C-alpha cells in the first residue's frame, strides 16, 4: 500500500526521540513536510540533522515546552509565519508517571495534566480552524493502554490519558463533518527512550538488550513492539487511506490489553 503525503504539513510534539522521531521519519519519507517540537535543544538538533539527511519533505524544528501555554502560542506564531497551516497534528509529548495515589502531589497532578492533556487541547484548538477551512485534517493522540483499563498505582498517567481518550471522541464528533479525523493510539510496551529510562532507573546489571528481551518475553507476542511499528500505524492514520476512520482508540500493545 503506497502512502503519499506530498504537500501535507505535520506537527509532531516530542519529536526528537523515540516514537515521535520514528513518526517524523515515516511521515517525512512519505513526502510530508515535518515540524518536530521538543524541549531539549541538543536532541532536537540531532533529530533535525538526521531527518534532513533522509528527507522527502521539508524539515523544521522548534524548541518548545508544551506544558507552557505561552510557549505554545509563540510556537504557533512562528509556524504560521514561517510555514503556514498544519494538516496533521500528532500529540505525542509525554512521559510515564505512576505511583500510589496518596503520594501524588497537587503539583505532580498539574504537571501531568498540562503535559499530556492541556498541551493536546491547546494545540488542537490552534490547528482546528485551518483544518475546517481546508476540509481536511488529521489529529492523532498518543495515549497509553491504561486509558481504557487503569490499574492500581497507574496514576497520574492513566487518569490524564483517559481524559485524552475522551478528548479524542469529542474532537472526532465535532470534526467529522469537516473531514477532520481524530484518532488515538494506545501504546503498550515499546522499545523507546522511555524504556531506556526505566532500565536506567531499575539498577539492573543486565544489558539494555537483555532487559528489553526479558520484559518483552512476558507479553502475549513474546516481545516488545518497536517505534517503527507505531510509526507505521500513525502514517496510515495520517493518510487518505484512513479516510473513513475517526473516533477510534486503537490498542498498539501486541495483545496486552483485555479491553478492545
Regions found by a protein language model. Name each.
Residues 9, 16-18:
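Conserved glycine-rich cofactor-binding loop
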Residues 129, 173-174, 243:
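Alpha-helical segment proximal to the catalytic Tyr-Lys
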